[in-house]
Amino acid sequence: MSLTRLNIEAFRNIQFAQLIPAPGINVIYGQNGSGKTSILEAIYFLGMGRSFRSHLSQRVINNDNDKLTLFATLNLARGDSKIGLRRFRSGETEVKIDGEKVKRLSTLAETLPIQVITPESFSLLFEGPKSRRQFIDWGAFHADPQFYGAWTNVRRVLKQRNQLLRNGAVYTHIQFWDQEFVRYAEQVTEIRNHYVDSLNGLLKGIIGEFLPSVDVKVSFTRGWDSKTDFAELLENQYSRDLATGHTVSGPHKADLRLRVGNLPAQDALSRGQLKLLVCALRIAQGKLLKQQIDKHSIYLVDDLPSELDAQHRQLLLKQLTDTGAQVFVTAIDPAAIVDSLHTPPNRMFHVEQGRVTVVE
């Protein structure tokens, strides 16, 4: 799978741009503020309906416009597919796939699986468990068609349960919701656990490429003691949940644990090593997607030279090339990317003040 055409209109400082990307490695270069990261962001927005730069997501629409428009043609195994998205200043989003209106943004994510390696994506290890749950759930969503419905139900029931707790409901009023909560929580947990097991099968070798002298153990924690019956736990923890006004244990507390020896990876590794570990996780996740559903991810790699030294840039780009996936990578100086590739990039684009030109 690859993007064969991308139109960007009124997105950040890009008034209009049309790109004809190539399969393989696409290098996008330009000075800071030129708009090169906005191209990656537009691709992500088209696949997720939101920005990967969360702190800037309210300013995606160009100041002179009342809406942004993104359009892409995808080359899929079954033929070409066309995706279009409009976002209005009101917050309304309109999505079409092959001319048909789409109501759920999850349909976008299913159609256009995207992996991101940016300065922000390193929060996967530097911050709390939320980003690691999202990492697991990205894979579980693509691997198992039952996951989205089960997780949607977990969130629905959890919201209702927490509202009852805040209202001081007696346990008999919560018990009905707990029966549903347990059923969907166990379904979500089983899918997540199976996914992490599958990921582990690939991870060891890939981590070994990036960090050959480090033994990283990866495990999944479900959000409650695996030896404890979840229904009994919810009943036994009712008083505690009532006091806090929310559900203390459950699949919404799950985590992906990465350890080196007896220490969390965050404490045992340097910041540079942690970045390499995140790269390994992203590569493994993309490879597993290809194995499970025979679909490539599209990789978006932002500002690579500032994040990794020359040796590790070369290693990451080799790993990305070996996946066979389409890759978009940005840099201020294109030589920092080109010199790290074993073969010339498939296509290069120069961005200046929001204007994009292909470099022959």
Curated annotation (Swiss-Prot):
Pfam families: SMC_N. Keywords: ATP-binding, Cytoplasm, DNA damage, DNA repair, DNA replication, DNA-binding, Nucleotide-binding, SOS response. The keyword Flavoprotein does not apply. It is found in: Cytoplasm. Disulfide bonds: none annotated. Its main location: cytoplasm. GO terms for cellular component: cytoplasm. One of its GO terms (molecular function) is single-stranded DNA binding. PROSITE patterns: RECF_1 (PS00617), RECF_2 (PS00618). Signal peptide: none annotated. Gene3D superfamilies: P-loop containing nucleotide triphosphate hydrolases, RecF/RecN/SMC, N-terminal domain. Belongs to the RecF family. The RecF protein is involved in DNA metabolism; it is required for DNA replication and normal SOS inducibility. RecF binds preferentially to single-stranded, linear DNA. It also seems to bind ATP. HAMAP family: RecF. This is DNA replication and repair protein RecF. It comes from Shewanella sp. (strain W3-18-1).
